[in-house]
Amino acid sequence: MNNAVTKIAKENLADLVTFAPRERFEPTDPIFKILPETQTVICLGFRVLRGIYRGTEEGTTYYQYTTMGVENMEETIMPMAQLRVAAFLEEKGFLALPQRRHQQIMAEPNSTNPEVAYDAVYRGKSAEVQLDFENTAVKCGLGGKGLSGAILTSDFGPFVRYCFILTTAKLKPTPLQTPYLCDGCQECVKACPGKAISKNGTRDPWQCAVYYNGANGTKNPFMPPDAFADLPDRTSIITGNKHLTPEQARKVLNEIYFYPPAQHAYQCSICGRACDTACYIHLEQNGLLKRKFKKPFRTREPWQFCADDFKTE
């Protein structure tokens, strides 16, 4: 059965397929609230093309990451693979329940999802039970958790998205991966254009949202010189040195009109997941990734603009 599931998933563009038995999860885990009869959690991992990140690296094209690396993955490619695998399992007489990220539904009352417009998020919806995606991925043997919280895989590093299927079928488990990729190098922390990741790996979702959307002018080719002219501390905002409260973050986000959003409320990533890119480069430089390329990802010093370009006086 494992081989058949893996074959169907890979025929539908999944790159990694792993399995976790129910015994790996605590009795209070959300999977048992969603489907109490769950016997196996299937994890489907999908590479985000390395080339998609090149646009931000070169400062030449940004829409490709958001549309091809996020929106189409989450809304088209990944659900199709889930549905095909789930249909196969149900044809065999087992229940199968796909689980994808709820990009616009949150249990937290005052958090946000940087990938979507903050005013499109429905907060405080605790009645909608959701998986802890990162911990579930680890328990499925997909990879290990990095300092920033990203799942790191030996094939693609952090350049991966993933989803799950809960099923009543008992399938052979994938061994847990011994964490070895993250060495605590802090490259993800240093790379964030808004200092949204602390040294211990805690991520501020509102700070992340502001700079994911491009509030750091030194890394945003679309920002006009008079951006945020009516906001206090605009220079600190533009250079990524201003720590923003959720209320302040909303005000900044209301003034970010640098680039059009995609469908389904997905915001264009101007930072291009700088944290993940820095992590990938570090893993590649240290020879820790299985998949090799003819040239290294980074071939020269990263570009940036001067903060003086945004002076209004």
Locate predicted features.
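Catalytic cores of enzyme domains
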Residues: 73-281, 291-299
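Non-catalytic, usually N-terminal nucleic-acid engagement modules in DNA/RNA processing proteins
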Residues: 1-83
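Flexible loop/turn segments at secondary-structure boundaries
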Residues: 26-27, 199, 217, 286
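Flexible, active-site-proximal loop/turn residues at the rims of small-molecule/cofactor binding pockets
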Residues: 23, 48, 171, 198, ...
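Short alpha-helix boundary/capping motifs
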Residues: 36-37, 117-118, 220-221, 303-308
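C-terminal non-catalytic accessory extensions
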Residues: 286-313
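Short, solvent-exposed secondary-structure capping/transition elements
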Residues: 53-54, 97, 288
